[in-house]
From Swiss-Prot:
Subcellular location: Cytoplasm
Organism expressing this protein natively: Mycobacterium marinum (strain ATCC BAA-535 / M)
Primary subcellular site in the record, as a coarse category: cytoplasm
One term under GO cellular component: cytoplasm
Keyword terms: Chaperone, Cytoplasm
Name of protein: Co-chaperonin GroES
Length: 100
């Protein structure tokens, strides 16, 4: 995982999606048009968190750089930076952190 010069704002998270499966368990090759959009990725950068209702302190996020997360299928915004594809997600789009 390369370091990127993108710093998410507030409760946003920068994720690099894991590669989609290219073959089935029985060895059949899956064409690009039939591949499922991956819902798992690695957190590359994390914003500082959003402000609380009083605007006095930041609410920290539940994820950190390097975490593997499962996120909502249609959540986030896809971007390309430095030849790599990333996803900028809101903290609400993250469904779970995968234990290593």
């Amino acid at each position: 995982m390369a370091k990127v010069n993108i710093k998410p704002l507030e409760d946003k998270i920068l994720v690099q999606a894991n590669e989609a499966e290219t073959t089935t368990a029985s060895g059949l090759v899956i064409p690009d048009t039939a591949k499922e959009k991956p819902q798992e990725g690695t957190v590359v950068a994390v914003g500082p968190g959003r402000w609380d209702e009083d605007g006095e302190k930041r609410i920290p996020l539940d994820v950190a750089e390097g975490d593997t997360v499962i996120y909502s299928k249609y959540g986030g915004t896809e971007i390309k930076y430095g030849g790599e594809e990333y996803l900028i997600l809101s903290a609400r789009d993250v469904l779970a952190v995968v234990s290593k």
